[in-house]
Amino acid sequence: MSSPVSLENAASTSNKRVVAFHELPSPTDLIAANPLTPKQASKVEQDRQDIADIFAGDDDRLVVVVGPCSVHDPEAAIDYANRLAPLAKRLDQDLKIVMRVYFEKPRTIVGWKGLINDPHLNETYDIPEGLRIARKVLIDVVNLDLPVGCEFLEPNSPQYYADTVAWGAIGARTTESQVHRQLASGMSMPIGFKNGTDGNIQVAVDAVQAAQNPHFFFGTSDDGALSVVETAGNSNSHIILRGGTSGPNHDAASVEAVVEKLGENARLMIDASHANSGKDHIRQVEVVREIAEQISGGSEAVAGIMIESFLVGGAQNLDPAKLRINGGEGLVYGQSVTDKCIDIDTTIDLLAELAAAVRERRAAAK
């Protein structure tokens, strides 16, 4: 990390609780060190259009955003991508598989905030290195012809890697945030807004409408300059049902209630994890199958599903004493350090079931 900027000359009333400012490379410089190739950029654009077409009802496939709750080990993430890529190709007629590659984690109170914030998992907060690692992982996944999906949490970090992203999400804790609605209005890919943590759907409905409109707000240019950002609005926004403290909302009745609110041609995504499964990876398998039943039964409203999946099922605690950098034996390879995930073998079976459900829906529509 760069040396902190001194605060000695700051006005006596300013920055009383700021310890230091650590400079970041500009987005332009970081991207130039690891750019997309023209072929990769073209693939990202096509993936974005495919996803937009599915949510618009112009493509009858199902978007499946699947991958780890969070990326903490780049090597394991790429191993997972190598398992997923052939499946994405084989099931492409029925599913648009997008790898979930999340680097930023919102915390209810405190905790590890993701690979960008603390890439070494040891509270050294080497954010410049985290940005470099994140960009490399994304490009490595894109190079496997896999679209990537990310949650956008920090309002300035997308400038460093959003060019690689085919689909984005605004999480349950930030859907009501004006900052994130404005951010979504300028993003170049389709964006999903989750319902609130309490299960409130209206905040996501409002967020979609807000993001569809132009905005002016404070932001950072590609050169790193503080700027007024003017956006055109993002017409490719949709709702993600993730359940809440009020209970799950992945069932057919909940989907129908949202359709009534949005209009008969509404299309949405369902998160099979989080409050829809109680963060239980075993229950998540059942939720995926319940959603597949809706699809095979003819529901056109379900255009996407999100699944938390990794090489090894379950989750482990992020114990600093286990880290090799601290002399420990190391974490379990390929297992989540945040929410519990479905293992890769079970995931493969579920993807085949979802593809079959799409084929049944397609046949019934003829």
Curated annotation (Swiss-Prot):
GO terms for molecular function: 3-deoxy-7-phosphoheptulonate synthase activity. Keywords: Amino-acid biosynthesis, Aromatic amino acid biosynthesis, Transferase. The keyword Amino-acid biosynthesis applies. Its EC number is 2.5.1.54. It is an enzyme of class 2 (transferase). GO terms for cellular component: cytoplasm. This is Phospho-2-dehydro-3-deoxyheptonate aldolase. It comes from Corynebacterium glutamicum (strain ATCC 13032 / DSM 20300 / JCM 1318 / BCRC 11384 / CCUG 27702 / LMG 3730 / NBRC 12168 / NCIMB 10025 / NRRL B-2784 / 534).
